A protein has these predicted regions:
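Helical element adjacent to the flavin cofactor pocket in flavoenzyme catalytic cores
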Residues: 2-34, 40-48, 52, 57-59
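Generic recognition of long tandem-repeat/solenoid scaffolds
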Residues: 2-3, 113, 204-207
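Short, flexible beta-strand-to-coil junctions
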Residues: 4-6, 105-106, 210-211
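Aromatic-acidic/polar surface patches that form glycan- and anion
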Residues: 6, 10, 127, 131, ...
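Flavin-dependent oxidoreductases
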Residues: 36-136, 140-158
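C-terminal catalytic lobe of FAD-dependent flavoproteins
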Residues: 148-214
Length: 214
């Protein structure tokens, strides 16, 4: 099956979106949180909180969702300016492993080759054997990656590793009304004193465990 579509440069597009929201006066702040309650201390008033922490919701106090688990994915970024076509091929029925080639728009001539799917693998580093298999599969689909000179001659730029936020039973999309500090002794004990006294009712939308969609 072939069709015409669009392809975007993911990192550049995210930077573009960040610039757009900042241009509209929206402030982007980064914080490391250990509990859901801490998020309500960042501003004097919050109408609604969206918990989209992915795998972080497994350890986030106040959520601690034990049904979350990772599915490690690995890709290889290569340089092949002559490759302009995307490829996507499932490695047999009943498997979640696909081999794919995605040219990344931009002057660098970069192409993304993938992929892998390893359940319950928390390792943050790239597996050389998986990388080799990815390059071999990619070359089989598109010899132009090295202008027909073999997979060993594909110009590798970098290796990427990510962990898909999988969840038993599917994603969680839920509106929760809760009171600060209601989540039990462990969460409550770790809350700073002044904020723990604030037990106001708050609203949170949980949106995580989206799995292969990231």
């Amino acid at each position: 099956v072939t069709y015409d579509s669009l392809c975007i440069n993911g990192p550049e597009y995210l930077l573009h979106l960040a610039r757009q929201v900042r241009n509209h006066g929206i402030v982007i702040r980064r914080h490391r949180l250990s509990s859901l309650d801490e998020a309500y201390d960042l501003y004097s008033h919050i109408d609604i909180l969206v918990n989209a922490t992915g795998l972080g919701s497994k350890a986030l106090l106040g959520v601690e969702d034990e049904t979350l688990f990772p599915a490690k994915g690995q890709t290889v970024l290569v340089r092949a300016p002559n490759v302009k076509t995307c490829y996507n091929h499932r490695l047999g029925w009943g498997t979640d492993i696909r081999r794919y080639i995605i040219p990344r728009p931009g002057p660098e001539g970069h192409v993304i080759c993938g992929g892998s799917y390893n359940v319950d693998d928390y390792a943050p580093f790239a597996d050389p054997k998986v990388a080799e298999r990815i390059l071999q599969d990619a070359y089989e689909l598109c010899p132009d990656l090295s202008i027909g000179r073999g997979w060993e001659n594909i110009e590798v730029v970098s290796h990427q590793v990510g962990h898909r936020p999988m969840r038993k039973g599917g994603m969680r999309l839920e509106l929760e009304t809760r009171r600060l500090g209601q989540t039990g002794s462990t969460s409550n004990a770790l809350r700073p004193g002044p904020q723990r006294r604030n037990r106001k009712q708050v609203t949170c939308v949980h949106a995580y465990g989206i799995g292969p969609a990231g």
